[in-house]
Curated annotation (Swiss-Prot):
Name of the protein in question: Argininosuccinate synthase
Keywords: Amino-acid biosynthesis, Arginine biosynthesis, ATP-binding, Cytoplasm, Ligase, Nucleotide-binding
Subunit (UniProt): Homotetramer.
CDD domains: ASS
Family under the similarity heading: Belongs to the argininosuccinate synthase family. Type 2 subfamily.
GO MF terms, alphabetically ordered: argininosuccinate synthase activity; ATP binding; protein homodimerization activity
Lineage: Bacteria, Pseudomonadati, Gemmatimonadota, Gemmatimonadia, Gemmatimonadales
One of the GO biological process terms: argininosuccinate metabolic process
Known catalytic reactions: L-citrulline + L-aspartate + ATP = 2-(N(omega)-L-arginino)succinate + AMP + diphosphate + H(+)
Length: 445
Protein backbone atom coordinates (compact mmCIF):
# COMPACT_ATOMS: atom_id res chain seq x y z
CA UNK A 1 0.00 0.00 0.00
CA UNK A 2 1.13 3.58 -0.64
CA UNK A 3 2.32 5.25 2.55
CA UNK A 4 3.06 8.68 1.06
CA UNK A 5 0.22 11.20 0.78
CA UNK A 6 0.56 13.78 -1.97
CA UNK A 7 -2.25 16.01 -0.71
CA UNK A 8 -3.11 17.34 2.73
CA UNK A 9 -5.40 14.91 4.61
CA UNK A 10 -8.28 17.20 5.54
CA UNK A 11 -9.83 16.61 8.95
CA UNK A 12 -7.14 14.15 10.06
CA UNK A 13 -4.44 14.39 12.71
CA UNK A 14 -1.07 15.17 11.16
CA UNK A 15 2.09 15.11 13.26
CA UNK A 16 4.87 17.47 12.24
CA UNK A 17 8.46 17.50 13.43
CA UNK A 18 8.45 21.13 14.54
CA UNK A 19 11.67 23.12 14.86
CA UNK A 20 10.15 26.55 15.44
CA UNK A 21 11.83 27.93 12.34
CA UNK A 22 10.16 29.64 9.40
CA UNK A 23 9.53 26.52 7.31
CA UNK A 24 7.77 24.41 9.93
CA UNK A 25 5.94 27.42 11.42
CA UNK A 26 4.44 28.35 8.06
CA UNK A 27 3.68 24.72 7.23
CA UNK A 28 1.92 24.11 10.53
CA UNK A 29 -0.27 27.22 10.24
CA UNK A 30 -1.03 26.44 6.58
CA UNK A 31 -2.12 22.89 7.44
CA UNK A 32 -4.47 24.17 10.15
CA UNK A 33 -5.90 26.81 7.80
CA UNK A 34 -6.52 24.20 5.10
CA UNK A 35 -8.44 21.91 7.44
CA UNK A 36 -5.97 19.41 8.87
CA UNK A 37 -5.45 18.91 12.62
CA UNK A 38 -1.71 19.46 13.20
CA UNK A 39 0.14 18.03 16.19
CA UNK A 40 3.65 19.39 16.79
CA UNK A 41 6.55 17.33 18.12
CA UNK A 42 9.94 18.83 18.93
CA UNK A 43 12.98 16.70 19.71
CA UNK A 44 15.40 17.99 22.33
CA UNK A 45 18.62 16.72 20.77
CA UNK A 46 20.88 19.13 22.64
CA UNK A 47 21.21 21.41 19.63
CA UNK A 48 24.00 23.87 20.53
CA UNK A 49 22.32 26.69 18.58
CA UNK A 50 18.97 26.38 20.41
CA UNK A 51 18.66 28.60 23.49
CA UNK A 52 15.10 27.89 24.73
CA UNK A 53 13.52 24.51 24.02
CA UNK A 54 10.45 25.21 26.14
CA UNK A 55 9.51 28.12 23.90
CA UNK A 56 9.21 25.93 20.79
CA UNK A 57 6.01 24.06 21.78
CA UNK A 58 4.46 27.38 22.82
CA UNK A 59 5.19 28.73 19.34
CA UNK A 60 3.57 25.67 17.80
CA UNK A 61 0.38 26.20 19.80
CA UNK A 62 0.28 29.84 18.72
CA UNK A 63 0.57 28.83 15.06
CA UNK A 64 -2.38 26.46 15.38
CA UNK A 65 -1.19 23.13 16.74
CA UNK A 66 -3.86 21.01 18.42
CA UNK A 67 -1.17 19.75 20.77
CA UNK A 68 2.57 20.40 21.06
CA UNK A 69 5.13 18.25 22.84
CA UNK A 70 8.82 18.49 23.61
CA UNK A 71 10.37 15.01 23.46
CA UNK A 72 13.60 14.50 25.45
CA UNK A 73 16.04 12.64 23.18
CA UNK A 74 19.52 13.62 24.40
CA UNK A 75 20.39 10.57 26.50
CA UNK A 76 19.28 8.19 23.75
CA UNK A 77 21.24 10.14 21.17
CA UNK A 78 24.42 10.01 23.26
CA UNK A 79 23.91 6.26 23.75
CA UNK A 80 23.65 5.74 19.99
CA UNK A 81 26.67 7.97 19.43
CA UNK A 82 28.78 5.91 21.84
CA UNK A 83 27.61 2.71 20.14
CA UNK A 84 28.77 4.11 16.80
CA UNK A 85 32.11 5.07 18.37
CA UNK A 86 32.60 1.56 19.79
CA UNK A 87 31.99 0.11 16.32
CA UNK A 88 34.00 2.71 14.41
CA UNK A 89 30.83 3.21 12.32
CA UNK A 90 32.24 6.05 10.24
CA UNK A 91 32.77 5.53 6.50
CA UNK A 92 33.28 9.08 5.21
CA UNK A 93 36.79 10.47 5.64
CA UNK A 94 39.30 12.59 3.77
CA UNK A 95 43.04 12.30 4.42
CA UNK A 96 42.48 10.99 7.92
CA UNK A 97 39.78 13.50 8.89
CA UNK A 98 36.56 11.70 9.87
CA UNK A 99 32.89 12.55 9.56
CA UNK A 100 31.26 11.01 12.62
CA UNK A 101 27.81 10.42 11.09
CA UNK A 102 26.26 12.83 13.57
CA UNK A 103 23.26 13.72 11.41
CA UNK A 104 22.39 10.08 10.55
CA UNK A 105 22.55 9.24 14.27
CA UNK A 106 20.26 12.16 15.04
CA UNK A 107 17.77 11.00 12.42
CA UNK A 108 17.72 7.47 13.86
CA UNK A 109 16.75 8.85 17.26
CA UNK A 110 14.35 11.52 16.01
CA UNK A 111 12.63 9.22 13.53
CA UNK A 112 11.89 6.59 16.15
CA UNK A 113 11.21 8.66 19.27
CA UNK A 114 8.96 11.27 17.64
CA UNK A 115 6.87 8.66 15.84
CA UNK A 116 6.57 6.72 19.11
CA UNK A 117 5.31 9.91 20.79
CA UNK A 118 2.82 10.39 17.96
CA UNK A 119 1.46 6.89 18.46
CA UNK A 120 0.73 7.78 22.08
CA UNK A 121 -1.54 10.56 20.76
CA UNK A 122 -3.09 8.30 18.11
CA UNK A 123 -1.39 10.30 15.36
CA UNK A 124 -0.57 8.06 12.41
CA UNK A 125 0.42 10.65 9.81
CA UNK A 126 3.65 12.57 10.08
CA UNK A 127 5.62 15.15 8.19
CA UNK A 128 8.96 16.92 8.43
CA UNK A 129 11.01 19.44 6.56
CA UNK A 130 13.19 17.10 4.51
CA UNK A 131 13.37 17.68 0.76
CA UNK A 132 13.18 15.11 -2.02
CA UNK A 133 16.83 15.60 -3.00
CA UNK A 134 18.36 14.79 0.37
CA UNK A 135 19.10 11.81 2.59
CA UNK A 136 16.69 12.62 5.40
CA UNK A 137 13.51 11.94 3.47
CA UNK A 138 14.53 8.27 3.21
CA UNK A 139 15.96 8.03 6.73
CA UNK A 140 12.79 9.38 8.32
CA UNK A 141 10.63 7.19 6.09
CA UNK A 142 12.46 4.04 7.16
CA UNK A 143 12.61 4.81 10.87
CA UNK A 144 9.02 6.03 10.93
CA UNK A 145 7.63 2.86 9.37
CA UNK A 146 9.80 0.67 11.58
CA UNK A 147 8.28 2.37 14.62
CA UNK A 148 4.68 2.49 13.37
CA UNK A 149 3.73 0.04 10.58
CA UNK A 150 0.47 1.94 10.05
CA UNK A 151 2.24 5.25 9.51
CA UNK A 152 1.40 7.42 6.54
CA UNK A 153 3.67 10.26 5.49
CA UNK A 154 2.61 13.74 4.44
CA UNK A 155 5.32 16.24 3.61
CA UNK A 156 4.22 19.76 2.67
CA UNK A 157 7.31 20.06 0.48
CA UNK A 158 6.00 17.19 -1.68
CA UNK A 159 2.52 18.78 -1.97
CA UNK A 160 2.26 20.87 -5.14
CA UNK A 161 -0.45 23.08 -3.64
CA UNK A 162 1.81 24.01 -0.74
CA UNK A 163 4.73 24.64 -3.09
CA UNK A 164 2.59 26.86 -5.35
CA UNK A 165 1.30 28.93 -2.43
CA UNK A 166 4.36 29.01 -0.15
CA UNK A 167 7.26 27.96 -2.31
CA UNK A 168 9.98 30.16 -0.82
CA UNK A 169 11.11 31.77 2.41
CA UNK A 170 9.80 35.19 1.39
CA UNK A 171 6.36 33.78 0.63
CA UNK A 172 6.29 31.91 3.94
CA UNK A 173 7.24 35.01 5.93
CA UNK A 174 4.62 37.11 4.12
CA UNK A 175 2.01 34.41 4.79
CA UNK A 176 2.66 34.46 8.54
CA UNK A 177 2.55 38.27 8.65
CA UNK A 178 -0.69 38.33 6.64
CA UNK A 179 -2.11 35.82 9.13
CA UNK A 180 -1.50 38.23 11.99
CA UNK A 181 1.79 36.93 13.34
CA UNK A 182 4.79 39.12 13.99
CA UNK A 183 7.61 37.62 12.01
CA UNK A 184 10.92 39.14 11.04
CA UNK A 185 13.08 37.16 8.66
CA UNK A 186 16.55 36.55 10.02
CA UNK A 187 19.57 37.48 7.96
CA UNK A 188 20.23 34.71 5.47
CA UNK A 189 23.41 32.78 6.22
CA UNK A 190 25.72 31.71 3.43
CA UNK A 191 24.93 28.08 4.26
CA UNK A 192 22.42 26.00 6.23
CA UNK A 193 23.13 24.33 9.57
CA UNK A 194 21.68 21.26 11.27
CA UNK A 195 22.95 20.23 14.68
CA UNK A 196 22.55 18.02 17.72
CA UNK A 197 24.65 17.25 20.78
CA UNK A 198 26.88 14.91 18.75
CA UNK A 199 27.82 17.42 16.09
CA UNK A 200 26.87 20.05 13.53
CA UNK A 201 26.48 19.92 9.76
CA UNK A 202 26.97 23.00 7.58
CA UNK A 203 26.04 22.64 3.91
CA UNK A 204 24.23 24.05 0.85
CA UNK A 205 24.13 27.56 -0.61
CA UNK A 206 27.70 28.94 -0.79
CA UNK A 207 29.18 25.67 0.50
CA UNK A 208 27.97 23.92 -2.66
CA UNK A 209 30.88 25.65 -4.39
CA UNK A 210 34.21 23.97 -3.73
CA UNK A 211 36.09 27.27 -3.96
CA UNK A 212 34.35 28.27 -0.73
CA UNK A 213 36.20 26.67 2.16
CA UNK A 214 35.71 26.05 5.85
CA UNK A 215 36.74 29.64 6.53
CA UNK A 216 33.27 30.99 5.68
CA UNK A 217 31.72 28.87 8.46
CA UNK A 218 31.07 30.22 11.94
CA UNK A 219 31.47 27.19 14.25
CA UNK A 220 28.67 26.65 16.78
CA UNK A 221 30.39 23.93 18.83
CA UNK A 222 33.90 25.28 18.97
CA UNK A 223 36.24 27.98 17.74
CA UNK A 224 37.43 29.12 14.33
CA UNK A 225 40.91 27.74 14.88
CA UNK A 226 42.14 28.97 11.48
CA UNK A 227 41.85 32.62 12.54
CA UNK A 228 45.08 34.07 13.87
CA UNK A 229 43.26 36.29 16.35
CA UNK A 230 41.66 33.26 18.04
CA UNK A 231 43.90 32.41 20.98
CA UNK A 232 44.07 28.71 21.81
CA UNK A 233 46.24 27.38 24.61
CA UNK A 234 47.45 23.80 24.39
CA UNK A 235 45.72 21.51 26.87
CA UNK A 236 46.38 18.03 28.25
CA UNK A 237 43.35 15.76 28.66
CA UNK A 238 43.15 12.25 30.14
CA UNK A 239 40.22 10.03 29.21
CA UNK A 240 39.42 6.71 30.85
CA UNK A 241 37.44 3.90 29.24
CA UNK A 242 35.97 0.86 30.96
CA UNK A 243 34.74 -2.01 28.79
CA UNK A 244 34.36 0.31 25.81
CA UNK A 245 32.60 3.19 27.57
CA UNK A 246 34.19 6.53 28.54
CA UNK A 247 33.83 6.90 32.31
CA UNK A 248 36.02 9.84 33.30
CA UNK A 249 37.78 12.91 31.94
CA UNK A 250 40.81 14.22 33.82
CA UNK A 251 39.91 11.94 36.71
CA UNK A 252 36.41 13.36 37.04
CA UNK A 253 33.51 10.92 36.87
CA UNK A 254 30.07 12.03 35.76
CA UNK A 255 26.52 11.19 36.75
CA UNK A 256 25.58 10.14 33.24
CA UNK A 257 26.98 9.58 29.77
CA UNK A 258 25.17 12.75 28.72
CA UNK A 259 27.09 14.83 31.27
CA UNK A 260 30.41 13.28 30.25
CA UNK A 261 29.71 13.88 26.58
CA UNK A 262 28.76 17.48 27.26
CA UNK A 263 32.15 18.02 28.94
CA UNK A 264 33.96 16.32 26.05
CA UNK A 265 32.24 18.76 23.68
CA UNK A 266 33.39 21.72 25.75
CA UNK A 267 37.02 20.53 25.87
CA UNK A 268 37.23 19.58 22.21
CA UNK A 269 35.40 22.73 21.18
CA UNK A 270 38.01 24.94 22.86
CA UNK A 271 40.44 23.76 20.20
CA UNK A 272 38.20 23.37 17.15
CA UNK A 273 38.83 19.62 17.30
CA UNK A 274 36.75 17.42 15.01
CA UNK A 275 36.03 19.87 12.19
CA UNK A 276 36.30 18.43 8.70
CA UNK A 277 35.43 19.20 5.08
CA UNK A 278 33.99 16.21 3.23
CA UNK A 279 32.69 15.31 -0.22
CA UNK A 280 30.38 12.33 0.13
CA UNK A 281 27.89 10.22 -1.79
CA UNK A 282 24.28 10.74 -0.77
CA UNK A 283 21.93 7.76 -0.64
CA UNK A 284 20.85 8.45 -4.23
CA UNK A 285 24.55 8.35 -5.28
CA UNK A 286 24.83 12.05 -6.14
CA UNK A 287 27.75 13.75 -4.42
CA UNK A 288 27.32 16.49 -1.84
CA UNK A 289 29.69 18.52 0.31
CA UNK A 290 29.54 19.33 4.00
CA UNK A 291 31.56 21.03 6.72
CA UNK A 292 31.23 19.12 9.98
CA UNK A 293 31.83 19.69 13.68
CA UNK A 294 32.06 16.96 16.32
CA UNK A 295 34.44 18.03 19.10
CA UNK A 296 33.35 15.53 21.76
CA UNK A 297 33.18 12.49 19.50
CA UNK A 298 36.55 13.37 17.97
CA UNK A 299 38.18 13.58 21.41
CA UNK A 300 36.69 10.30 22.64
CA UNK A 301 37.50 8.56 19.34
CA UNK A 302 41.19 9.45 19.59
CA UNK A 303 41.39 7.77 22.99
CA UNK A 304 39.22 4.80 22.01
CA UNK A 305 41.17 4.01 18.84
CA UNK A 306 44.48 4.29 20.69
CA UNK A 307 43.32 1.64 23.14
CA UNK A 308 41.91 -0.55 20.36
CA UNK A 309 45.26 -0.61 18.56
CA UNK A 310 47.16 -1.32 21.78
CA UNK A 311 44.86 -4.10 22.98
CA UNK A 312 43.70 -6.06 19.93
CA UNK A 313 45.68 -8.04 17.36
CA UNK A 314 46.08 -7.03 13.73
CA UNK A 315 43.37 -9.29 12.30
CA UNK A 316 40.82 -8.12 14.86
CA UNK A 317 41.65 -4.47 14.15
CA UNK A 318 41.37 -5.07 10.41
CA UNK A 319 37.94 -6.67 10.80
CA UNK A 320 36.84 -3.87 13.14
CA UNK A 321 37.77 -1.29 10.50
CA UNK A 322 36.17 -3.18 7.60
CA UNK A 323 32.96 -3.79 9.53
CA UNK A 324 32.99 -0.22 10.84
CA UNK A 325 32.99 1.17 7.31
CA UNK A 326 30.16 -1.17 6.31
CA UNK A 327 28.17 -0.21 9.39
CA UNK A 328 28.88 3.49 8.86
CA UNK A 329 27.42 3.33 5.38
CA UNK A 330 24.34 1.46 6.63
CA UNK A 331 23.90 4.11 9.33
CA UNK A 332 24.22 6.86 6.72
CA UNK A 333 21.51 5.15 4.64
CA UNK A 334 19.04 5.06 7.51
CA UNK A 335 19.58 1.37 8.27
CA UNK A 336 20.97 1.64 11.82
CA UNK A 337 18.25 -0.70 13.12
CA UNK A 338 18.31 -3.20 10.24
CA UNK A 339 19.37 -6.81 10.99
CA UNK A 340 22.68 -6.50 9.12
CA UNK A 341 23.54 -3.45 11.23
CA UNK A 342 22.58 -5.13 14.50
CA UNK A 343 24.81 -8.06 13.59
CA UNK A 344 27.82 -5.80 12.94
CA UNK A 345 27.11 -3.71 16.05
CA UNK A 346 26.85 -6.72 18.34
CA UNK A 347 30.10 -8.14 17.00
CA UNK A 348 32.11 -4.96 17.61
CA UNK A 349 30.56 -4.09 20.95
CA UNK A 350 31.01 -7.60 22.32
CA UNK A 351 34.39 -8.65 20.95
CA UNK A 352 36.19 -5.32 20.43
CA UNK A 353 34.76 -2.75 22.84
CA UNK A 354 34.41 -5.07 25.82
CA UNK A 355 38.21 -5.37 26.12
CA UNK A 356 38.81 -1.61 25.82
CA UNK A 357 39.68 -0.54 29.35
CA UNK A 358 42.41 1.98 30.10
CA UNK A 359 43.51 5.61 30.01
CA UNK A 360 44.83 7.81 27.23
CA UNK A 361 46.36 11.25 27.69
CA UNK A 362 46.20 13.64 24.75
CA UNK A 363 47.71 17.08 24.21
CA UNK A 364 45.30 19.23 22.20
CA UNK A 365 46.50 22.22 20.22
CA UNK A 366 44.70 23.93 17.29
CA UNK A 367 42.05 22.20 15.22
CA UNK A 368 42.89 18.56 14.65
CA UNK A 369 46.51 19.02 15.75
CA UNK A 370 47.16 16.81 18.77
CA UNK A 371 49.68 14.39 20.27
CA UNK A 372 49.07 11.24 22.28
CA UNK A 373 51.16 11.63 25.43
CA UNK A 374 50.45 8.43 27.36
CA UNK A 375 48.53 5.15 27.08
CA UNK A 376 47.92 2.72 29.92
CA UNK A 377 45.79 -0.39 30.23
CA UNK A 378 45.97 -3.73 32.01
CA UNK A 379 44.76 -5.24 28.72
CA UNK A 380 47.56 -3.95 26.49
CA UNK A 381 49.19 -6.54 24.26
CA UNK A 382 51.79 -3.93 23.38
CA UNK A 383 54.80 -5.07 25.41
CA UNK A 384 58.03 -3.28 24.45
CA UNK A 385 60.23 -5.91 26.13
CA UNK A 386 59.24 -8.42 23.45
CA UNK A 387 61.02 -6.45 20.73
CA UNK A 388 63.55 -4.36 22.66
CA UNK A 389 66.94 -3.86 21.07
CA UNK A 390 68.51 -3.99 24.51
CA UNK A 391 69.63 -7.14 26.30
CA UNK A 392 67.02 -8.79 28.45
CA UNK A 393 64.63 -11.72 28.52
CA UNK A 394 64.44 -13.28 25.07
CA UNK A 395 60.94 -14.21 23.89
CA UNK A 396 62.43 -15.90 20.82
CA UNK A 397 65.97 -16.64 19.65
CA UNK A 398 67.90 -15.97 16.43
CA UNK A 399 67.46 -19.66 15.59
CA UNK A 400 63.69 -19.29 15.94
CA UNK A 401 63.72 -16.43 13.43
CA UNK A 402 65.92 -18.40 11.02
CA UNK A 403 63.35 -21.20 11.08
CA UNK A 404 60.52 -18.77 10.50
CA UNK A 405 62.30 -17.15 7.53
CA UNK A 406 63.13 -20.56 6.06
CA UNK A 407 59.42 -21.40 6.01
CA UNK A 408 58.87 -18.26 3.93
CA UNK A 409 60.84 -19.90 1.10
CA UNK A 410 57.71 -21.82 0.12
CA UNK A 411 55.62 -18.79 -0.80
CA UNK A 412 58.64 -16.86 -2.16
CA UNK A 413 59.25 -19.67 -4.67
CA UNK A 414 55.56 -19.68 -5.61
CA UNK A 415 55.60 -15.90 -6.07
CA UNK A 416 58.72 -16.04 -8.27
CA UNK A 417 57.10 -18.69 -10.48
CA UNK A 418 53.95 -16.58 -10.83
CA UNK A 419 55.99 -13.53 -11.86
CA UNK A 420 57.61 -15.62 -14.62
CA UNK A 421 54.16 -16.65 -15.85
CA UNK A 422 53.12 -12.99 -15.98
CA UNK A 423 56.27 -12.12 -17.99
CA UNK A 424 55.44 -14.87 -20.49
CA UNK A 425 51.89 -13.55 -20.78
CA UNK A 426 53.16 -10.03 -21.45
CA UNK A 427 51.68 -8.57 -18.26
CA UNK A 428 55.14 -7.79 -16.86
CA UNK A 429 58.46 -7.11 -18.52
CA UNK A 430 61.73 -8.70 -17.50
CA UNK A 431 64.41 -6.52 -15.93
CA UNK A 432 68.07 -6.99 -16.72
CA UNK A 433 69.10 -4.58 -13.97
CA UNK A 434 67.10 -5.73 -10.94
CA UNK A 435 66.29 -9.26 -11.97
CA UNK A 436 62.72 -8.65 -10.79
CA UNK A 437 59.94 -8.34 -13.39
CA UNK A 438 58.45 -4.84 -13.59
CA UNK A 439 55.09 -3.41 -14.56
CA UNK A 440 55.34 -1.74 -17.97
CA UNK A 441 55.58 2.05 -17.83
CA UNK A 442 53.26 4.20 -19.90
CA UNK A 443 56.03 4.79 -22.45
CA UNK A 444 56.43 1.03 -23.01
CA UNK A 445 52.91 0.66 -24.41
Amino acid sequence: MANILQRLPIGEKVGIAFSGGLDTSAALHWMRAKGAVPYAYTANLGQPDESDYEEIPRKAMAYGAEKARLVECRSQLVAEGLAALQCGAFHVSTAGQTYFNTTPLGRAVTGTMLVAAMREDDVNIWGDGSTFKGNDIERFYRYGLLTNPNLRVYKPWLDQQFIDELGGRTEMAEYLIASGFEYKMSVEKAYSTDSNILGATHEAKDLEFLNKGMHIVHPIMGVAFWRDEVKIEKETVTIRFEEGYPVSINGREFGSALELFTEANVIGGRHGLGMSDQIENRIIEAKSRGIYEAPGLALLFIAYERLVTGIHNEDTIEQYRINGKKLGRLLYQGRWLDPQSLMLRESAQRWVAKAVTGEVTVELRRGNDYSIMDTSSANLTYKPERLTMEKGQEYFSPLDRIGQLTMRNLDIIDTRDKLSIYVSAGLLRGSSTTGVPQLPSGSDE
